[in-house]
Amino acid sequence: MAKKSVTKKKNVKKNIARGIVCISASFNNTNVTITDEMGNVLCWATAGGLGFKGSKKSTPYAAQQAVESAMEKAKEHGIKEVGIKVQGPGSGRETAVKSVGAVEGIKVLWLKDITPLPHNGCRPPKRRRV
């Protein structure tokens, strides 16, 4: 029986000047996704993917490292200007936004908070008793 040949997908480096940094900061992890203006994903990074495990994923330092990793990948695509979308209540929100602004050679154009707020929707989970 003949073996199937596995073809590896090539990472195509695009030359894009503007992008959008989407930061999703949950209570457990921080996701950073960098897209072009149409919404096509160029690169991404997560705190858990960088080696932070357990409760360390939700720290501001882990969020900062995730942003720095994603922005290094984005520079390979030629991104010079970004807009920032922030979603979620996590502890890494402010640190992630500050570290996007601190990256050399990348200018921040705008900042939006797109956290969904319920108009009295589902009942929230009960308070923790520790």
From Swiss-Prot:
Domain of life assignment: Bacteria
UniProt keyword annotation of Transport present: no
Chaperone recorded as keyword: no
UniProt KW keywords: Ribonucleoprotein, Ribosomal protein, RNA-binding, rRNA-binding
One Pfam match: Ribosomal_S11
Single Gene Ontology BP annotation: translation
An example Gene Ontology CC term for this record: ribosome
Signal sequence segment: none
MF-aspect GO terms: rRNA binding; structural constituent of ribosome
PANTHER family: 40S RIBOSOMAL PROTEIN S14/30S RIBOSOMAL PROTEIN S11
Function: Located on the platform of the 30S subunit, it bridges several disparate RNA helices of the 16S rRNA. Forms part of the Shine-Dalgarno cleft in the 70S ribosome.
Subunit structure, interactors included: Part of the 30S ribosomal subunit. Interacts with proteins S7 and S18. Binds to IF-3.
Assigned protein family: Belongs to the universal ribosomal protein uS11 family.
Full protein name: Small ribosomal subunit protein uS11
Gene: rpsK
